[in-house]
Amino acid sequence: MEKKSIAGLCFLFLVLFVAQEVVVQSEAKTCENLVDTYRGPCFTTGSCDDHCKNKEHLLSGRCRDDVRCWCTRNC
């Protein structure tokens, strides 16, 4: 009886491990690119994000430490 419960527990961990690996492999890679069309210094990430989504048709955008707008896209 104890061997069955240990085997069942091992099987459950194996299924969970395989399911987690499948999720990790299906994630898309993203890349950041500097935006040439954004004018002025980038202080608010919201305006950069709007620009990247609406004008560049990319995933998102953010202001980085160099006060420039960087857009995120799928690689």
From Swiss-Prot:
Disulfide bonds join C31-C75, C42-C63, C48-C69, C52-C71. It is found in: Secreted. GO terms for biological process: defense response to fungus; killing of cells of another organism. InterPro entries: Defensin_plant, Scorpion_toxin-like, Scorpion_toxin-like_sf. Keywords: Antimicrobial, Disulfide bond, Fungicide, Germination, Plant defense, Secreted, Signal. Coiled coil: none annotated. Residues 1-24 form the signal peptide. The keyword Glycoprotein does not apply. It comes from the Eukaryota. SUPFAM superfamilies: Scorpion toxin-like. One of its GO terms (cellular component) is extracellular region. PROSITE patterns: GAMMA_THIONIN. The keyword Disulfide bond applies. Its main location: secreted. It holds the Pfam family Gamma-thionin. Belongs to the DEFL family. This protein is required for germination. This is Defensin-like protein. It comes from Vigna unguiculata.
